[in-house]
Design a protein with these regions (language model features):
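A short beta-strand-loop structural module common to alpha/beta enzyme folds
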Residues: 65-78
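Flexible, glycine-rich loop/tail regions that form catalytic "lids" or insertion modules at the edges
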Residues: 38-41, 103
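N-terminal [4Fe-4S]-dependent radical SAM core
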Residues: 8-38, 45-46, 209-240
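Glycine-rich beta-alpha loop elements in corrinoid/cobalamin-binding modules
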Residues: 75-217
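Conserved alpha-helical elements of sugar-nucleotide-dependent glycosyltransferases
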Residues: 49-57
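Charged, often flexible domain-edge or linker segments that flank or initiate folded functional domains
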Residues: 2-16, 91-94
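Short helix-loop-beta junction
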Residues: 56-68
């Protein structure tokens, strides 16, 4: 069966950026898992695949029988133009499925200049950019990586952030849209996990020079101070 993606690949540079199927990529039947997770890197394929953290978390999640982690990267301008022309939404490499139907999307925040790409990727997926505009029909959107320590510039976008090393915490924050908890109940539950920051559960006050004056919890489940997660035993985690 020829898909829309197959049809437009001949019109773009470096089409193998969008085909998947590389050595060591993971193929599962989405119907056999409980959670579909999209690991999103807001840059092109070449840059994303050079990132060691992606490989660690990708295989860490895919080692679980109940989870399917797929890769989602920012298309280059020629591919983006073709996607818009053909009404094609942002997709995952492994299955080619639209990420709108996933349970959770995790963006790694490696550098601030990628923030506009995060917004663009959500728009290409037809997913509301602001967390407050997304109900349970949309994926939960989380952020991690070095820039998550300064979360406020993009706090309105994300449902929550994972601070520190995610090899442990990623197992504790799985979200399935068909589960019993609604989005707020889910966020209240994970807000009690070490290293999890839920922006909507805090009021941020600014000084006149736009620096942060105070961060005050507005939800009883929110920790007064969120501390980064530290991996205590690297022998227990996946290493590519």
């Amino acid at each position: 069966m020829i898909t829309t993606r197959d049809k437009i690949l001949s019109a773009v540079m470096k089409p193998t950026r969008y085909t998947g199927g590389e050595l060591n990529s993971v193929i599962k039947n989405p119907a056999d898992v409980d959670v579909r997770f999209g690991f999103c890197f807001a840059d092109t394929y070449e840059i994303a695949m050079s990132h060691l953290g992606l490989k660690i978390l990708y295989h860490t999640l895919n080692d679980r029988e109940d989870t399917y982690c797929e890769r989602v990267f920012a298309p280059w301008t020629d591919m983006e133009e073709e996607m818009k022309k053909h009404g094609m939404k942002l997709f995952a490499l492994e299955t080619g499925d639209e990420i709108t139907h996933f349970d959770m999307l995790g963006f790694t925040l490696q550098y601030e200049l990628s923030y506009s790409n995060i917004v663009n990727m959500l728009m290409l997926a037809d997913i509301p950019v602001r967390a407050k505009d997304r109900d349970e029909s949309y994926p939960i959107v989380c952020g991690g990586g070095p820039c998550a320590y300064n979360a406020e510039p993009v706090a309105d976008i994300f449902d929550f952030f994972m601070l520190g090393e995610g090899e442990d915490s990623i197992h504790e924050v799985k979200w399935k849209k068909s589960g019993k908890k609604n989005k707020r109940d889910y966020l209240e539950a994970i807000a009690e996990i070490e290293g999890i920051y839920v922006p909507s559960f805090y009021d941020v006050e600014y000084n006149d020079d736009n620096t942060v004056k105070s961060v005050t919890p507005n939800n009883p489940h929110a920790k007064p101070k969120v501390r980064k997660r530290i991996m205590k035993d690297f022998n227990a985690t996946y290493a590519p």
